[in-house]
Structure formats: C-alpha cells, structure tokens
C-alpha cells in the first residue's frame, strides 16, 4: 500500500473556499483524459501519488470523464480504495453530474432517477 510523503504539506499553499471554511490547495488534479479505460493504470496511480506527495489534496472528476464515460470515476475509485484509504480524510474529491451517460429518458441531464442510478455503480 502507498505511503504518503510526510512533508507533503510543507510547500503547497492552501486557501479557504468561499465562506465554507474548506481549505483547498492552489493546484488540483483534474482526471479528464488521463484516467479513462484507455490509460495505463500504473500511470494513473503514479500521477495520484505524485500529486498527493506534493500537497495536492483535491481531485476533480465528472461522470463523463474517460474515455469511456464514467471510467475515470471507476479507476480513481479503485485507487482511492486500494491505495488512499488511510488518507481518505485528507482528500477532497469533486464530481459533476448532468452529462449524457446512456440511452433513454433517465441517462442524462441530472434527473433525480439519473443521479440515484448513477451513484449505484461508483
């Protein structure tokens, strides 16, 4: 299992997010094109390790990130479960909803059913 750098918070600057009190790093790691099923899983893990070791605690996803829509969330979820579980309380994971995911009336645009079904596989 991954061991984070003990000095990971020494060089990154953090700022409050609005009036929420949440502290976010100056840099985040966006997982749009780098974490789909066409990518190399070991490279995905190393990107996450390097980011976290340098104080990046915010990972940005969306339900249509891939390629193959949804695959970035799936792959990052695997990394989170297998490698980052000891650090889960130090991470901010954001996502978005509302993009086309599958055919039919419930596969797009953020309906209540879409959001409930979409969470089931993550």
Predicted regions and their residues:
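Structural motif corresponding to the early beta-alpha repeats
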Residues: 83-113
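Conserved small/polar residues in nucleotide/adenosyl-binding loops
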Residues: 120-122
């Amino acid at each position: 299992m991954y061991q984070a750098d003990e000095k990971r918070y020494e060089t990154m600057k953090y700022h409050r997010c609005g009036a929420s009190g949440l502290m976010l790093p100056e840099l985040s790691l966006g997982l749009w094109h780098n974490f789909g099923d066409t990518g190399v899983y070991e490279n995905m893990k190393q990107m996450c390790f390097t980011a976290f070791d340098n104080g990046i605690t915010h990972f940005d996803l969306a339900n249509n990130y891939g390629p193959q829509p949804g695959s970035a969330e799936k792959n990052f979820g695997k990394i989170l479960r297998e490698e980052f579980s000891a650090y889960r309380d130090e991470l901010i994971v954001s996502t978005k909803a509302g993009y086309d995911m599958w055919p039919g009336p419930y596969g797009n645009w953020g309906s209540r059913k879409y959001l409930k079904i979409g969470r089931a596989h993550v």
